[in-house]
């Protein structure tokens, strides 16, 4: 759906909801305002997880309220209806009508989907929204997912993440060798090339894996979520920045067959609810991370450190190699990479004299 059509649809949905008017399908002339739907949403998140999990639950509530209960959505935490990392397949085959997760969880099946979550040293949260909503990214995403019988919608944003929790100090490149680390997506592939053993485990297993030594290090999100999982009690060293996930976007995926059964006004309301959820989640993380960071700074058992420059330089070099190989893998990856990289280039130039320049100035005087 083009952005102009999307905004027009939102206005139609808002007007119909506020005024209580009948909704008549333009192509059939049939009044569908009394039709009701009960859907299931599967997610990758532990129950009640701040930000990610609660964001999915709030999305469902927002849709139900805006549709006057015409569309009710029951939310399942990861593992309740399907495994946490099986959301994509479950929604594609119709086990559930909706799913809430991160596109890079399915990189084995849809490699190019990683562009729609996060790319190492790539777009930050605001830049991702700009590319998706105005730069053609969302249209590419929707077209790419058609072959899997899915409709993707941006539905959450955490902002830049942290580099991860480590049970040993990282003072040089050599310290990465042999580490067993939970880090998904392209960041995981980059870390593998740096000598790390990349391991994928769902959020619910990270704490125990760190405690038992099954993991030496783990990247999850940032202070807000990491504290909620107790990761500060399982590892001592907390490194930044989140070079691998500068602006990770979450996705709502809808089974295409189910989507096609919805009246146009309900489709527009779902899209509007996702856009509101995207904004709300980013605000929640900005606030929650700031507060949780203060807690960690006051914890004598936690050391917050920057990754050494030589480590970041190596990770950037390896990231460039990984992304180049991904873009050469298939036609879809090449198309999406070109769109993404073209916008990253011009946006980075703008950031130098806007956001980055301001933050540099503020830090120099505060």
Q: Where do the PLM segments sit?
A:
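N-terminal secretory/targeting leader peptides
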Residues: 2-128, 145-366
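A gly/proline- and charged-residue-enriched helix-loop-helix capping module
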Residues: 127-140
């Amino acid at each position: 759906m083009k952005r102009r059509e999307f905004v027009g649809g939102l206005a139609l949905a808002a007007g119909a909801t506020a005024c209580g008017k009948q909704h008549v399908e333009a192509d059939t002339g049939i009044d569908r305002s009394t039709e009701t739907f009960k859907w299931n949403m599967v997610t990758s998140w532990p129950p009640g997880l701040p930000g990610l999990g609660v964001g999915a639950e709030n999305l469902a509530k927002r849709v139900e309220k805006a549709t006057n209960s015409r569309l009710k959505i029951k939310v399942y935490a990861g593992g309740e209806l399907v495994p946490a990392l099986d959301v994509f397949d479950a929604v594609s085959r119709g086990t559930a009508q909706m799913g809430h997760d991160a596109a890079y969880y399915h990189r084995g099946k849809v490699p190019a989907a990683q562009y729609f979550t996060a790319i190492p040293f790539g777009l930050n949260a605001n830049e991702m929204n700009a590319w998706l909503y105005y730069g053609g990214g969302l249209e590419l995403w929707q077209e790419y997912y058609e072959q899997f019988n899915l409709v993707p919608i941006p539905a959450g944003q955490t902002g830049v993440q942290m580099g991860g929790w480590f049970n040993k100090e990282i003072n040089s490149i050599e310290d990465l060798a042999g580490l067993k680390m939970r880090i998904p997506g392209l960041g995981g592939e980059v870390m593998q090339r740096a000598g790390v053993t990349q391991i994928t485990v769902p959020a619910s297993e990270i704490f125990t894996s760190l405690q038992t030594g099954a993991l030496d290090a783990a990247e999850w999100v940032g202070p807000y979520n990491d504290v909620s999982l107790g990761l500060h009690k399982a590892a001592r060293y907390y490194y930044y920045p989140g070079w691998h996930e500068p602006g990770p976007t979450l996705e709502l995926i809808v089974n295409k067959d189910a989507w096609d059964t919805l009246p146009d006004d309900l489709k527009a309301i779902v899209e509007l609810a996702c856009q509101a959820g995207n904004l709300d989640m980013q605000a929640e993380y900005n606030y929650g991370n700031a507060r949780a960071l203060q807690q960690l700074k006051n914890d004598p058992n936690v050391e917050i450190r920057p990754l050494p420059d030589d480590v970041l330089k190596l990770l950037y070099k390896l990231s460039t190699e990984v992304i180049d190989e991904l873009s050469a893998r298939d036609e879809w990856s090449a198309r999406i990479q070109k769109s993404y990289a073209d916008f990253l280039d011009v946006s980075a130039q703008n950031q130098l004299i806007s956001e980055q320049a301001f933050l540099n100035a503020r830090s120099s005087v505060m």
